[in-house]
Amino acid sequence: MSNSSRNATEQNNKCSAAGVNSVAAALCPLSNCQFSGVVISAIADEQKLEFNNIYKSSCTLSCSYDSQGVLVRIMLDNDQGHVLKEYMLSADTDAAQLGKRSYAVSLESDNLVLRFASDKDQQLFRKVVENVKHLRPKSVFSQRTEESSASQYFQFYGYLSQQQNMMQDYVRTSTYQRAILGNSIDFQDKIVLDVGAGSGILSFFAVQAGAAKVYAIEASNMAQYAQQLVESNNVQHKISVIPGKIEEIELPEKVDVIISEPMGYMLYNERMLETYLHARKWLKPQGKMYPTHGDLHIAPFSDDSLYSEQYNKANFWYQSAFHGVDLTTLHKEGMKEYFRQPIVDTFDIRICMAKSVRHVCDFLNDKENDLHLIDIPLEFHILQTGICHGLAFWFDVEFSGSTQNVWLSTSPTAPLTHWYQVRCLLPMPIFIKQGQTLTGRVLLEANRRQSYDVTIDLHIEGTLISSSNTLDLKNPYFRYTGAPVQAPPGTNTQSPSEQYWTQMDTQQQQQGSRNSNSMLNGGLSVNGMADPGMDINLGLMHPH
């Protein structure tokens, strides 16, 4: 028996002894389960049962739990650091045993034959398939989300005040309405699905555009308030509010259009986009998605003030005599915690040191799995010399309609929204010169707290200079105060003092010119109106 199969057997026995009948327990033997020495073939001729080896050498199959079943990764035995292919093993996977060591399995669009190194390995893999097929988890959502996180999430969106905060975002709400009403041809007499409907405002827009029926899905307590709005506006024959998660509910029919507002900070936070993509199972072929795709923009920035602010906060823990207590042992952890916080605020785009890199998420075609691990390569051509303190993030989404395309932007050059922008600091900033190239990557790794761990890795090309950081998108620092955005230092090309006095002189000259014109006209000016024929002496009292 191989070490991998022995480990899987031991884990299987432990779970059986525990007698736990949960999804996690049922999948327990799959944890860190690997099968080495597997020969993978494709069916070349079904009638003659002829097979062709896909890879030149034997492979290792790695099986790990995923929210949709089991993720199977294929690697070469002699190069396990490189994943050749990934497949999702789900309850719908077709599979069959072929003899004692082989197994035929249909994974996505590939029909494969797996020949294992031993009978025992084949039996264990068959157990993997059987476990997945017998699982009927409550929902994809419940598998990817901690119960405590889900509870807080739906409680938060169940408050009217939070719905009001989003509805009063004029840019957000008006852009959605314009996108829907401006493409009424996509909604006229159509069946519409509103995912995460909240108050139902988008459902009302769909009805305004002529929708025949709207299914408004809302998992929080806000569903009851949405129902009240539907009834008070007499559109209950048009809008059907369905309490629940889209991953769990059933619709009576397929839909023509899906509408939703699934974006979070940095586009991906809250993992609502996965729910939005999951809803496509109810979308008719050639159906529409509003919005259609999202662009995440990333740019290096320089901001000494922000960096110093966070650094000085952490220095609280550098005190050796705080009320007689030495805190310095926690300074390193304090520094780490503050720099793990993404900063949510807004800024002048002139702090960006290069043109932003754009990463596209295609809501019509991307899969939910694509959002579990998002790897974004970076290459910036630096436009100004300075200190790079980290990366700035914002996003745009496009509504691609049949009549017109409409964009909703959270760029620092666009009107401010409740998404603001997000900045991720480097604990060790790097000095970079104009003309140099900054390369690296951003890795967004989904977690069960409905958020992402964000890893930044930057390197100045042609040097040994690099810097990195990992941040917790679930725990941002909300820095926005409402104060006007200040221009970055060094952007004045003229004396601000002289500019001010010149402006004052100009205003005084203009005022003097207006007064002179009034006197020359010989009239009395009242609220800017004058009668040139009026005698200004009339009505004046003279001493006797």
Curated annotation (Swiss-Prot):
Methylates (mono- and asymmetric dimethylation) the guanidino nitrogens of arginyl residues in proteins. May methylate histone H3 at 'Arg-17' and activate transcription via chromatin remodeling. The keyword Cytoplasm applies. Pfam families: PrmA (PF06325), PRMT_C (PF22528). The keyword Lipid metabolism does not apply. Residues 150-459 form the SAM-dependent MTase PRMT-type domain. Belongs to the class I-like SAM-binding methyltransferase superfamily. Protein arginine N-methyltransferase family. The dimethylated protein is the major form. Gene3D superfamilies: Hnrnp arginine n-methyltransferase1 (2.70.160.11), Pleckstrin-homology domain (PH domain)/Phosphotyrosine-binding domain (PTB) (2.30.29.30), Vaccinia Virus protein VP39 (3.40.50.150). GO terms for biological process: chromatin remodeling; peptidyl-arginine methylation, to asymmetrical-dimethyl arginine; positive regulation of ecdysone receptor signaling pathway; positive regulation of transcription by RNA polymerase II; regulation of DNA-templated transcription. S-adenosyl-L-methionine binds at Q163, R172, G196, E218, E247, T275. It is an enzyme of class 2 (transferase). The modification Asymmetric dimethylarginine is found at R514. Keywords: Chromatin regulator, Cytoplasm, Methylation, Methyltransferase, Nucleus, S-adenosyl-L-methionine, Transcription, Transcription regulation, Transferase. It catalyses: L-arginyl-[protein] + 2 S-adenosyl-L-methionine = N(omega),N(omega)-dimethyl-L-arginyl-[protein] + 2 S-adenosyl-L-homocysteine + 2 H(+). GO terms for cellular component: cytoplasm; cytosol; histone methyltransferase complex; nucleus. This is Histone-arginine methyltransferase CARMER. It is found in: Cytoplasm; Nucleus. Homodimer. PANTHER family: HISTONE-ARGININE METHYLTRANSFERASE CARMER-RELATED (PTHR11006:SF10), PROTEIN ARGININE N-METHYLTRANSFERASE (PTHR11006). The lineage of its organism: Eukaryota, Metazoa, Ecdysozoa, Arthropoda, Hexapoda.
